[in-house]
């Protein structure tokens, strides 16, 4: 059975000390985002490419399985992931809450 696309809200900090998935942060209104840090600058799509590479590595999927659906020029992005919902949910639940 092929994977369905899963969406993931992320908050990206570019020009960071290292590439990492920091954890999940939730606002008072209940919206949650996965917080990411990438070393790449937000210049000519470099940070966006780093985000896709980081998420692919964290989830164990190919870089081509991660795309930016919304927010290419924003810190707040919506990613589309070609992964099963169950695998994504297990990964997400294991992330620290920050």
Each PLM stretch: what is its role?
Residues 1-44, 48-52, 63, 67-73, ...:
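Contiguous, often N-terminal, cationic amphipathic patches that form binding interfaces
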């Amino acid at each position: 059975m092929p994977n369905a696309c899963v969406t993931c809200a992320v908050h990206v900090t570019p020009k960071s000390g290292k590439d990492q998935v920091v954890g999940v942060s939730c606002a008072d209104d209940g919206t949650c985002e996965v917080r990411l840090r990438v070393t790449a600058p937000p210049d000519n799509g470099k940070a966006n490419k780093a985000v896709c590479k980081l998420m692919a590595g964290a989830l164990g999927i190919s870089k081509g399985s991660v795309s930016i659906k919304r927010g290419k020029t924003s810190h707040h992005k919506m990613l589309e992931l070609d992964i099963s919902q169950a695998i994504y949910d297990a990964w997400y639940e294991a992330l620290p809450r920050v």
